[in-house]
């Protein structure tokens, strides 16, 4: 079992060698049963790996304390874990590979944000490549049934149920009101076959962290069968929210004012902010900012092109995303005066269909060879094994042509492209890429 604690030595002007740290494991009764030095202590993280089977079944607090060499305290942090004799069966949970498992099978959420569920639009959506949706308007039973009938899962929004916040329902004035409404939703839909996850946080500020953490604990108690998903624009503050979610997403919407490579930067940072221990379902842009602007400001916007949407989706996957929920389906209708829905929908489906085709690969947990990338920092790689084949994704996250060399440990016999330009083979295990701007390339390597 890996244990990690965030440190802020760099911000404090302290070097790692100037301090020491220790992890203490305590029972629910407060008895310390183990004290361990970290396996590694760096400027921003202390890590330890322990054998959980050494601990009797029960609840534990893990506390990390940081001190100077002379014994002066530099702070502490703690978390909880529950040691079980056997992992309980869950309808939906996140496994050790950060994949969502639904009814015992890996599931890659491929969906879009909705406003409210409307059956005529649902009919159109169900014919596309998507397997889930996240409607802001929390669905009723009839709408949940309609989604299930079409083979669609629902990420159910309870993100507004915080009294005193902007979008809280008018009658929600107290914590008791929040609890009553959440219990009601869990009772109504916790066992519904369409339910995939609970959407608990949509870009809430950091000063809400304590309330968000309490909400996470509540959802773990009320419905341990489904994970929670939070989405932030504060991509470089994710670490401060770690106690508030099971799954995290961030939502880079760069087009047209910023480079499409923001998708790569945000996903890399999101992954690293979680110590690469949490599932990441990213929220790439498919909408036109003009849907939210007027007059001259609206005229300055445009929708992302098919090339940009493809690149941003694969940038997210390459940097570690195990789910994609695009923003947004409902905005595709708002710009029909200059971008007909039919054309935009066709482009969105073409992009998502490419991801859907490779979902069996993206969900593989078979041990894959390590790869190293030499060249532009704008290139991200990720590798999977599926049977006797190795799949290597490499994405150029910049709007310029770049080159990079990827070295595959153990080498390979042949290479062919699933999409993108086939890289040049040069030496044992070496692939030399000449990327077009924003180009994603997926190759299949045979050993």
Predicted segment positions?
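Aromatic-lined substrate-binding rim segments of carbohydrate-active enzymes
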Residues: 119-185, 207-227, 260-263
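Active-site clefts of carbohydrate-active enzymes
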Residues: 162-167, 271-307, 331-335
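Glycan-recognition and catalytic regions of carbohydrate-active enzymes
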Residues: 332, 342-389
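N-terminal carbohydrate-binding accessory modules
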Residues: 72-126
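Aromatic/acidic polysaccharide-binding cleft in carbohydrate-active enzymes
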Residues: 296-353
């Amino acid at each position: 079992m890996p244990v990690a604690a965030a440190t802020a030595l760099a911000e404090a002007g302290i070097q790692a060698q100037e301090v020491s740290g220790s992890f203490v494991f305590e029972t629910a009764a407060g008895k310390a049963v183990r004290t361990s030095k970290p396996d590694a202590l760096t400027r921003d993280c202390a890590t330890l790996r322990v054998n959980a089977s050494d601990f009797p079944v029960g609840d534990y607090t893990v506390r990390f304390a940081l001190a100077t060499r002379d014994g002066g305290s530099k702070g502490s942090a703690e978390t909880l874990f529950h040691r079980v004799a056997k992992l309980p069966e869950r309808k939906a949970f996140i496994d050790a590979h950060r994949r969502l498992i639904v009814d015992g099978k890996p599931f890659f959420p491929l969906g879009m944000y909705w406003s409210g569920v409307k059956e005529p639009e649902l009919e159109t959506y169900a014919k596309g490549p998507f397997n889930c949706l996240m409607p802001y308007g929390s669905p009723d039973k009839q709408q949940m049934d309609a989604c299930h009938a079409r083979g669609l899962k629902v990420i159910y929004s309870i993100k507004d149920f915080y009294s005193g916040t902007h979008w809280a329902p008018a009658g929600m004035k107290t914590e008791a009101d929040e609890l009553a409404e959440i219990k009601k939703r869990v009772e109504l839909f916790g066992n519904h076959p369409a339910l995939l996850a609970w959407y608990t946080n949509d870009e809430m500020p950091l000063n809400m962290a304590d309330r968000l953490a309490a909400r996470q604990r509540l959802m773990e108690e009320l419905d341990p069968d489904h994970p929670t998903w939070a989405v932030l624009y504060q991509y470089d503050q994710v670490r401060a929210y770690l106690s508030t979610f099971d799954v995290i997403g961030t939502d880079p919407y760069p087009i047209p004012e910023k480079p499409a490579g923001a998708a790569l930067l945000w996903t890399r940072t999101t992954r690293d902010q979680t110590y690469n221990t949490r599932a990441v379902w990213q929220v790439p842009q498919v909408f036109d900012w003009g849907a939210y602007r007027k007059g001259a400001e609206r005229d300055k916007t445009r929708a992302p092109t098919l090339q940009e949407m493809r690149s941003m989706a694969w940038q997210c996957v390459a940097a570690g995303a195990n789910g994609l929920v695009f923003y947004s389906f409902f905005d595709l209708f708002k710009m029909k005066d200059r971008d007909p829905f039919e054309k935009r929908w066709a482009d969105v489906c073409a992009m998502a269909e490419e991801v859907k085709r490779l979902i069996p690969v993206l969900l593989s947990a078979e041990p894959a060879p390590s790869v190293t990338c030499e060249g532009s920092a704008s290139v991200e790689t990720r590798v999977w094994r599926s049977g006797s084949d190795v799949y290597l994704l490499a994405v150029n996250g910049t709007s310029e042509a770049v080159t990079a060399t990827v070295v595959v440990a153990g080498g390979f016999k042949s290479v062919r492209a699933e999409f993108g330009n086939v890289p040049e083979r040069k030496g044992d295990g070496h692939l030399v890429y000449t990327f077009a701007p924003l180009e994603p390339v997926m190759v299949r390597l045979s050993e």
